[in-house]
């Protein structure tokens, strides 16, 4: 497999699990939720015949087929699925070192580039106050619609953070962006930092 390695021990463990499903042709589907973000999670699920997606990459293994989610494939590069026995029986492990690595460039869609800068440059600073900001939408006029959460929701400094920090950073990095707009309900102040 090019993007992911499934060890013999993991293959045998998964093949045993699949054989107990009493579904001819059942395989696994490997995907990453929220790939390229700090929230990325690598998942393996049963995949009955017909449940695979049309753009999945089918990888034929000795006893079953592994379907790799098309969006997840670049993030599965160098991933390893292994099974290790221990005193309690054993554990299936998935190591995907690139799952949280953003993969954007100047040609990436604007929403992906905004999310990249929010996750890599802006949210790490907001985290020191227990806050974060997320992209809700990019409207037709080139405005990024953002929503604060955590310690930033209801914070008295949110306007300053939005204009002097977030907007300035995003406009420097993404020239076609025209501005940002906050849609947070700042009347909720119970978690506010200031």
From Swiss-Prot:
Cofactor(s) recorded in Swiss-Prot or TrEMBL: [4Fe-4S] cluster
Recorded GO MF terms: 4 iron, 4 sulfur cluster binding; iron ion binding
Protein name, per record: Fe/S biogenesis protein NfuA
Gene Ontology terms describing biological process: iron-sulfur cluster assembly; protein maturation
Tagged with keyword Metal-binding: yes
Cofactor note: Binds 1 [4Fe-4S] cluster per subunit. The cluster is presumably bound at the interface of two monomers.
Record-stated family: Belongs to the NfuA family.
Subunit relationships: Homodimer.
Residues the record lists as binding [4Fe-4S] cluster: 152, 155
Nucleus as UniProt keyword: no
Task of the protein: Involved in iron-sulfur cluster biogenesis. Binds a 4Fe-4S cluster, can transfer this cluster to apoproteins, and thereby intervenes in the maturation of Fe/S proteins. Could also act as a scaffold/chaperone for damaged Fe/S proteins.
Alphabetical keyword list: 4Fe-4S, Iron, Iron-sulfur, Metal-binding
